[in-house]
């Protein structure tokens, strides 16, 4: 039977050296490894991951959040923060703050010839809408404790009339 110390440690602490990394590869632009750190913890409103981008690659598409706020802590390497239509240099030691809303679509790009390692920390607000300006898509997701999680990805131009399918 686990001790109270073991239980607390397992529910409160993650070490990046002990978590398994999952690779996201979608050529030609995306090649990242990541570990979700908050899964299995008692965290309720914060999420975190440890991310590694390969040279010349991105981890996710250019996007913005309607509800979630994000922070990135650059641990090793350098690259570019594409944000609000601008390209900003980033490097080891930088802490990046991205509030929700339409003013700060963002994407981290490894523009160097070595790996870029960083923490991604975010609030876990639901419901959430995420927009992708380059492709015109949106993601809407949410969940209620009494139902299955809800999620849909669509394009703005493919929407339905409010009354579609209603009696």
For the regions a language model picked out, list residue spans one by one.
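Conserved short histidine dyad/triad with adjacent acidic residue
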Residues: 31-36, 49-65, 103
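Short, conserved, surface-exposed binding loops centered on an aromatic residue
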Residues: 39-42, 52, 63-65, 73, ...
